A protein has these predicted regions:
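N-terminal leader/targeting and accessory segments in enzymes
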Residues: 1-94, 98
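Phosphate-binding loop of NTP-binding sites
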Residues: 91-151
Length: 151
């Protein structure tokens, strides 16, 4: 299991939400897709082409440790710890800001932008920097070519 990223209380504060329940396990990652959710992940119920709120109960069935949902979400049987916010995307952005603020002042962040070649460039940077600083380089597992890729 991964080391816990958040306590439930810190998650609620960072998201600017209201707690509904308590998280029964360490919160170790994030997911916006129940197909890739791992036990302990925090599920974020985003609305896009589909409404993530339709998948909250499924996320808990797959082991989600908590979910960030709209304040208007109606709790279902089987739901676990909820963080109720006005807008789940804004809540996720708050969590991202809080996570970034936890970085050491010595940490460096590299952003790769553009219309072609981002994934290859990211992977090349990760490989090169990992040689210089083994175990100290972090990169997204995949590209998130959307508005929540780097909230």
């Amino acid at each position: 299991m991964n080391a816990p990223l958040w306590t439930f209380e810190d998650l609620v504060q960072a998201a600017g939400g209201v707690a509904g329940g308590t998280a029964p396990m360490p919160l170790t990652g994030f997911s916006i897709d129940t197909r890739t959710l791992k036990p302990g992940d925090i599920f974020v119920a985003l609305k896009d082409q589909r409404d993530g709120h339709d998948f909250v109960t499924s996320a808990f069935a797959k082991g989600a440790g908590a979910a960030i949902v709209s304040a208007s979400y109606v709790r279902q049987t089987g739901d676990g710890a909820l963080v109720r916010v006005a807008d789940p995307l804004k809540g996720l952005e708050g969590v991202a800001r809080a996570a970034r603020s936890r970085l050491s002042p010595a940490a460096r962040v590299i952003a790769v932008t553009g219309s072609v070649g981002k994934t290859g460039t990211k992977e090349m940077l990760k490989a090169c920097l990992s040689l210089a600083a083994p175990g100290r380089v972090h990169a997204a597992d995949k590209s998130f070519n959307n508005h929540w890729g780097v909230p």
